[in-house]
């Protein structure tokens, strides 16, 4: 197989992997077909970011063996800080590299028909349900080489299913711990909320090691029925040696359904992030709030897109990013209103603050409108720290580093304060504190 870089798995390996995990025939066949498709599909072409030489395929091992946790106390302090250890009623999934290490789901939620488990177990035990949605309504296998490779190599992730008329009152959490230098992660998260249901899902990606050249290919899909609501929070905190492709996509299928995203994109390595919400149903609502801090020499590209198909649909994008050192980033915000989506409203704001002469940021607001009776607006700004602000703070006896930190918090606060998940707010503040030192 020729992918510019040699891929370390082949068809025979995938057959063996699928059989080992007792996967249904549809998933095994999907893997094999996807690997073939990846041969000919092009790489994605993120706007203004050249990824030709990025490593998305070269990794030592597709999986490594880890042990399940005998207790959450066995986690490192850094990981335990993300979890409410004392809460005995928490709904939690912990994954160590690719290994499902801990799962807790209350009997009450089980009795209501809620399913929450790792993606490979879900494919085996709830085959028809997973097959119905897996890379169908959200991300398609053949979009480009990286989506095809993801479909072929999925080795982790979670499945969350909320039946009709069920409201999950407390957040569902998944923690994905990267602790091996040798392995790649192809994580797939699939969330389905049936009619008149609601759920909040929060995930953490965290590295406890810093490999030289790791590969992460992450896809999340959210599907909502009539009047269903999903709030999806994420804090990505992977180390500088990890090259990441992450694609989070929502499909608001049902009328008056809602998908909200609260994303803290804090990776230290090169990252391509796509976040698209398709508002198919009439009266649907999509909202994406994103906070980014880049540092070192990393290159990042963030594309946030809300596409309106349904009448009277509403879409809001709010992104603030801070670039330090020699980091560079592209922020693309796209509001697209398709023909027939009358009364739709598309609004967006993207702002980038650069803290050094070598830092680079670019904000590109884009509106694509194919309908007359709509409302749309955008705002964007890119700039450096105002020296007058720093001078004012320093003149009050505040050291320069502390003054810069206060300016950064002031810049990011309008987004952080608007995040709909309190736990994500607290985690983000902690990560921001570490990254802006």
Curated annotation (Swiss-Prot):
Transmembrane segments: none annotated. One of its GO terms (biological process) is iron-sulfur cluster assembly. Belongs to the iron-sulfur cluster assembly SufBD family. The SufBCD complex acts synergistically with SufE to stimulate the cysteine desulfurase activity of SufS. The SufBCD complex contributes to the assembly or repair of oxygen-labile iron-sulfur clusters under oxidative stress. May facilitate iron uptake from extracellular iron chelators under iron limitation. Part of the SufBCD complex that contains SufB, SufC and SufD. This is Iron-sulfur cluster assembly protein SufD. It comes from Bacillus subtilis (strain 168). The lineage of its organism: Bacteria, Bacillati, Bacillota, Bacilli, Bacillales.
